[in-house]
Design a protein with these regions (language model features):
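Intrinsically disordered, low-complexity terminal tails and inter-domain linkers enriched
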Residues: 182-245
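Membrane-proximal helix-loop-helix interfaces that form the catalytic/acceptor-binding platform
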Residues: 2-190, 238-522
Length: 522
């Protein structure tokens, strides 16, 4: 039951204030996509966001059952992160021992980054869960090979690719483990430790362990004779023989992922320039900022990095798989990000549990109380960021975008026949989606729209080419613009701005964090 405390703690922390921060721009994209009919959702994937299409389809079914409130939209991510913490503990137990697993899971539970992505209606929490699950299933398949275990691994990898394409860089770490088992033996990959920790190296003895002479007798691992597999482990010779086919079985297990994810990759590749046009090329300084980025706290990220380095040294070869699961995806995405716009820290959140596993090994050699004090320290260091991420999901956290506040102003002052105009329209701020989410059927008519998001199979609506004509019948216009503007109409460019300034007068302006809403009349 080593998984239970981390899972329960993660669930409790992640549910705290889960709906306090309003949906931010990426979550608004999820809401817009997932609330469309399946046919329109498929068409959207052909235009933009194909890589996230399977997640949108999952959320479409979820919303049909549980609705689209902020809590309902984020609950799948909360559950996924809670399960991730439990599986991280289980993976640590399988690779090292129960104490390392417990500490790893608890560290993951208290990270601000865990709460941040647990409280977001995006695929990162689910991808993190599948990354840990796939790695755990790989360990099981390499230790006790069977087609059922390899089939489970194949399903997890395929689901991982469908959820988050970049998370498939994890397969580089899996390949290292498989090749070491194939060419040498499980010990070379750090997979020879019995899951119950029956034998630990001398350097891994905890201070509260009894002296060697006082320990109960434990049978040594099997000597490789036929049938010499004991509960919780198996004969090393038997594992070696099974390892002869590890590479072939692993490659076969990747076939479903190739068949399912391959077409998605081809479509997503064609959308890259539009999807990631805001991403800058990767720089070396980005690597230094990564721990704080994925942990959502510079202090906690630094602590986690230091603990992981100490833990890796303590674990020796048993650190190989978790260390590879951190380093290889990071290096691969960084190398690709130098050439193409790909380097976004949150894309690497799936590596965090493996860093926690290494970090959990650092204090595992002391008594439980001091070891837990390290977890408490990480939690205390992250408290300011925990509070901040529950205020807003924008970054920096001072850059709040208050869609809810704008919607409240309009709801309090609107009259029948009012219309609404947004500027800019084609922006990642999704001004129209933000107000539509909070106002629902009460939102004034979007007067300039001639082709809405569903009709365009896009995340943005299309506006009329002659704004003055489209505004001809309007008497009162609600204008929503990005940023603080003392004269909102003057901030609207082009023909749209000219039509507003020539035909209307600004009657009242309401500044809100990140936005300005104004009422214009003839």
């Amino acid at each position: 039951m080593v998984w239970l405390p981390p899972a329960a703690l993660t669930l409790a922390v992640s549910l705290t204030g889960v709906s306090r921060a309003q949906l931010w721009r990426d979550e608004l994209a999820t809401w817009s996509a997932a609330t469309r009919p399946v046919g329109d959702l498929v068409r959207l994937a052909g235009t933009i966001d194909a890589a996230t299409g399977p997640y949108y389809l999952l959320m479409h079914g979820w919303i049909a059952l549980f609705g689209d409130s902020t809590t309902a939209l984020r609950l799948p991510s909360v559950l996924a992160m809670a399960a991730t913490a439990g599986l991280t503990a289980r993976l640590g137990e399988r690779l090292v021992d129960a104490r390392v697993g417990l500490l790893a899971g608890l560290l993951l539970a208290v990270l601000p980054g865990t709460s941040r992505y647990a409280q977001e209606a995006r695929p990162y929490a689910l991808a993190t869960l599948l990354a840990v699950l796939a790695t755990l299933l790989l360990v099981e398949a390499l230790r006790r090979p069977s087609w059922a275990r390899w089939a489970g691994y194949a399903a997890a990898v395929a689901a991982l690719g469908l959820t988050h394409l970049i998370a498939l860089t994890l397969l580089a770490a899996h390949a290292v483990a498989v090749l070491l088992v194939q060419w040498r033996d499980p010990a070379a990959a750090g997979l020879d430790t019995p899951p119950d920790g029956a034998e630990r190296p001398a350097d891994s003895r905890r201070r509260d362990d009894p002296p060697a002479d006082d320990r109960p007798d434990v049978e040594p691992p099997g000597d490789g004779q036929p049938g010499d597999a004991r509960p919780g482990g198996e004969g090393l010779g038997g594992v070696r023989r099974a390892g002869r086919h590890a590479l072939l079985r692993w490659l076969v297990a990747l076939v479903p992922a190739v068949l399912l994810v391959g077409p998605l990759v081809l479509v997503a590749r064609g959308q890259r320039s539009r999807q990631l046009d805001w991403v800058d090329p990767a720089r070396l300084t980005d690597l230094a900022a990564l721990p704080g980025g994925v942990a959502q706290s510079g202090a906690v990220g630094g602590l986690l990095l230091g603990l992981a380095a100490l833990g890796a040294g303590r674990l020796g070869r048993r650190a190989l798989l978790p260390a590879a699961c951190v380093l290889l995806p990071v290096l691969l995405v960084f190398a690709a990000g130098v050439v193409v716009p790909l380097w976004v820290p949150r894309y690497l959140v799936f590596t965090v549990p493996f860093g926690c596993l290494l970090a959990g090994a650092a204090p595992a050699g002391v008594r439980l109380a001091p070891a837990l004090a390290v977890v408490v320290l990480a939690g205390l260091l992250g408290l300011p960021d925990q509070a901040g991420l529950r205020r807003t999901h924008e970054w920096p956290r001072s850059a709040t975008v208050d869609y809810r506040g704008v919607a409240r102003v309009i709801a309090d002052h609107e009259q029948p026949g009012d219309v609404i105009v947004f500027s800019p329209r084609e922006s990642w701020l999704f001004l129209d989606l933000g107000t539509a989410y909070h106002l629902g059927s009460r939102q004034p008519r979007d007067v300039l729209v001639v082709c809405d998001q569903r009709q365009r199979a896009d995340l943005w609506a299309g506006e009329c080419d002659r704004p003055a004509e489209c505004l001809a019948g309007a008497g009162r216009v609600w204008l929503v613009v990005a940023g603080w503007r003392s004269d909102p109409a003057a901030a609207v460019p082009g023909a749209k701005g000219a039509a507003l300034r020539d035909g209307f007068t600004v009657r009242q302006v309401w500044p809100r964090p990140g936005l300005t809403v104004a009422l214009l009349t003839r």
